Amino acid sequence: MRTTYMAKPLEVERKWYIVDAEGQTLGRLASEVASILRGKLKPEFTPHVDAGDFVIVINADKVKLTGNKLNDKIYYTHSLYPGGLKKTTAGAMLNKRPDRMFELAVKGMLPKNSLGRQMFTKLKVYAGTEHPHAAQKPEVWQIRG
């Protein structure tokens, strides 16, 4: 009788990938990165095990938004005090914190539980081309499609 293979957390081999966001559409790139973080592109993918790889995203400030989203898309934050709701447009967020904008896009595509939070820690986003992870020897990831 055959049984389905279930990956154990300690058996998972993790790689480091680097993704260049220059000229890429935000949502399409974020969904690709979320798949890598979850490990869905590996043959040993197991839903309840963090089998994903580390992802470094560079040039997050040069990511592309389609349509009129620079003006129309709004990010909300709240200070937890009465009247503490703050709004920021995507254009202002791209100028001020492009790394945070990409992180929020990917975070929304990961599971909303402790496993998703653990997967999110493997994402490293940088606005420019400089990053401190050269020692990990990341491989360049070619975007599908």
From Swiss-Prot:
Keyword 4Fe-4S included in the entry's annotation: no
Protein name per its UniProtKB record: Large ribosomal subunit protein uL13
One example GO MF annotation: mRNA binding
Quaternary structure, from the entry: Part of the 50S ribosomal subunit.
Any one GO biological process: negative regulation of translation
Transmembrane segments: none
The organism's taxonomic lineage, starting at the top: Bacteria, Bacillati, Bacillota, Bacilli, Bacillales
Annotated function: This protein is one of the early assembly proteins of the 50S ribosomal subunit, although it is not seen to bind rRNA by itself. It is important during the early stages of 50S assembly.
Family: Belongs to the universal ribosomal protein uL13 family.
Pfam families, A to Z: Ribosomal_L13 (PF00572)
Record's keyword terms, sorted: Ribonucleoprotein, Ribosomal protein
GO annotation, cellular component aspect: cytosolic large ribosomal subunit
